[in-house]
């Protein structure tokens, strides 16, 4: 009798779950990422290895670290990505402001993960630039900017704060995985992930590693000019292709607040309708416009909370409106996320 070409369902599942190890022509070198890993054949340590071509074309099994990441982040209720298509629109500044906004409620615990590997600015803005990473039997301990605000960044690992990080993609991806797998985040109400501009390896890695544990969505940051909106359209397209919900769009630097009289005037003209019109065109929520206040830069330079230092600023009131709009988009009670009694 001719053998059947149909495999048993259980054996098929077993093969998919346990792919065969590729036949190597040389022993695995030191620092090898593993012949079955997602980085096999592409990592920096693979350069010059006789097995590189074999590993690069071999079938890849599921990443064994994904379940560990999911378990590590099981105590995190909400995960939010902060994205911008263009650099210089104030994305990291907005991340720090959003973190302080959430942390104004003492009942909430907030974490910020800085994945802008080559330009880590979050520690400076949150006042923990001089901190270092402490390693214990339970993992890496984040730095605490406040009793309820934790921070993790590559800045804590640099011997000198002005050292440049010159890394290729696989090494960046490895560090992001460590931030998720090895950092003892504990129980958090919100984990904010600050990302670099564009759609690079860092964005793909964060999406891959967090997909199983669940991402609430992404907040887009732009300025009113069309040159910024052009890149935001690409970023929104990236999110839709990657299966990431876009929670809303924030228009930063929408005006200028005079520090003397607090009058607001327009500097960057919304030549094509600005963020509000783009949000309508793309079918996403418009969370609000935040004016440019020089005191925001001052608060970030000193690592202080803008909300505590300048509660009467129009920018402060606008940011609180953005936070409440974001809470609504996430299905949360805005008055619980940012209680009314905390308003100026």
From Swiss-Prot:
InterPro entries: Mrp-like_CS, Mrp/NBP35_ATP-bd, NUBP1/Nbp35, P-loop_NTPase, YlxH/NBP35. ATP binds at residues 85-92. It comes from the Eukaryota. Its cofactor is [4Fe-4S] cluster. The keyword Nucleotide-binding applies. GO terms for molecular function: 4 iron, 4 sulfur cluster binding; ATP binding; ATP-dependent FeS chaperone activity; iron-sulfur cluster binding; metal ion binding. [4Fe-4S] cluster 1 binds at residues 32, 46, 49, 55. Keywords: 4Fe-4S, ATP-binding, Cytoplasm, Iron, Iron-sulfur, Metal-binding, Nucleotide-binding. Binds 4 [4Fe-4S] clusters per heterotetramer. Contains two stable clusters in the N-termini of NBP35 and two labile, bridging clusters between subunits of the NBP35-CFD1 heterotetramer. PROSITE patterns: MRP. Its main location: cytoplasm. GO terms for biological process: iron-sulfur cluster assembly. [4Fe-4S] cluster 2 binds at residues 258, 261. Component of the cytosolic iron-sulfur (Fe/S) protein assembly (CIA) machinery. Required for maturation of extramitochondrial Fe-S proteins. The NBP35-CFD1 heterotetramer forms a Fe-S scaffold complex, mediating the de novo assembly of an Fe-S cluster and its transfer to target apoproteins. This is Cytosolic Fe-S cluster assembly factor nbp35. The lineage of its organism: Eukaryota, Fungi, Dikarya, Ascomycota, Pezizomycotina. The gene is nbp35.
